[in-house]
UniProtKB/Swiss-Prot annotation:
Recorded GO CC terms: cytosol
A GO MF term: DNA-binding transcription factor activity
Major subcellular site: cytoplasm
Organism of provenance: Vibrio anguillarum (strain ATCC 68554 / 775) (Listonella anguillarum)
Full protein name: Ferric uptake regulation protein
Span list, region Dimerization: 85-142
Entry's transmembrane regions: none
One Pfam family per UniProt: FUR
Family: Belongs to the Fur family.
InterPro entries given in the database record: FUR, Fur_C, WH-like_DNA-bd_sf, WH_DNA-bd_sf
Tree of life domain: Bacteria
SUPFAM superfamilies: Winged helix' DNA-binding domain
Protein's gene: fur
Keyword Membrane among record annotations: no
Amino acid sequence: MSDNNQALKDAGLKVTLPRLKILEVLQQPECQHISAEELYKKLIDLGEEIGLATVYRVLNQFDDAGIVTRHHFEGGKSVFELSTQHHHDHLVCLDCGEVIEFSDEVIEQRQREIAEQYNVQLTNHSLYLYGKCADGSCKQNPNAHKSKR
């Protein structure tokens, strides 16, 4: 049995061809932080006949099952990435939409200190930093918030 079949079963989902194909696409490095529409277009490019409504439904099921994480970066469009074992935060360019993942133990420690200061037991958090590419290589894009990875 393939790892993807087992992952779906472990999440309590029936193994179906659309779920397997969508999971395969999400595992491609360039398909992290991808919208439902972008995922649908990628499936079409691969010759898969999976409808947009099915893509939305499967992504919602994956989100509920913890297979993917849904992000709402500036611009309002949901993007998805496979859930990972390691925590990371995101830096997002407001002009071109590039998403950079990073981890910083100093930031993590400070967040734990703040939670303790306010007598809150921290269970989870998300940190999104927004800015603009400063190195002159930003490819301003009318479809900002499309991830480049």
